[in-house]
Amino acid sequence: MHIPDGFLDPLVAGLFWLGSAVTIGLAVRHARSELGDERTPLLGVVAAGIFAAQMLNWPIPGGTSAHFVGGAFAGILLGPSLGVLAMTAVVTIQALVFGDGGIIALGGNLFAIAVVNVLIGYGLFRMFREIHESGAAFIAGWAAVTLSALIVALGVGFSSAFAYEIGTTVTIMTGGHAVLGIIEGAITAGVYTYIAAARPDLVFTQFENSNLSPDVKL
């Protein structure tokens, strides 16, 4: 899903950078009240785990690549603000250190993976968790990765610098990730269900509406 440099027109890349900068800035502002000695270790553990999972990539014809994303899981476990920051760290390190995704295109990758994936996943989980928590986690994981792929497909499809037309990018990128999203949804649901049962104090969505503060000890 990472967009290399040369795939986006300057205007499209600039719009992605603007959207990413505004959202990440708001996340930093809100995270100040959440990030402390209890949540900092968890933030690092989640980011490291997702970083490792994202290193597995499968090429997609007519697009970039398909891989596990993990933003929905980060949003559910850490909350939207810390989830955005965790995924921002993952995507930025991948681009700057490992060359996974371009530097100019970093704004697009951040918007798709660190913004859309986290916020859509978190929002859908909140919407459906009263019906069935594990099912809500599955829906969040599947829909978040599919919609993130759609954002990437639209970005490169609207760019004249990219060789394929928007119909091709949307069909192949979104379709490929919709299939992969089934696996991501299942993993998100499975890991969430286990953690929520074993260590509910780790899960942001378990205490966000209560007056209790999380007591996180890793």
Swiss-Prot record:
InterPro entries: CbiM/NikMN (IPR002751). It is found in: Cell membrane. Coiled coil: none annotated. Keywords: Cell membrane, Membrane, Transmembrane, Transmembrane helix, Transport. It is a multi-pass membrane protein. GO terms for biological process: transition metal ion transport. The keyword GTP-binding does not apply. The chain crosses the membrane at residues 7-27, 42-62, 73-93, 101-121, 138-158, 178-198. GO terms for cellular component: plasma membrane. It holds the Pfam family CbiM. The keyword Transcription regulation does not apply. Belongs to the CbiM family. NikM subfamily. May be involved in metal transport. This is Putative metal transport protein HQ_3621A. It comes from Haloquadratum walsbyi (strain DSM 16790 / HBSQ001).
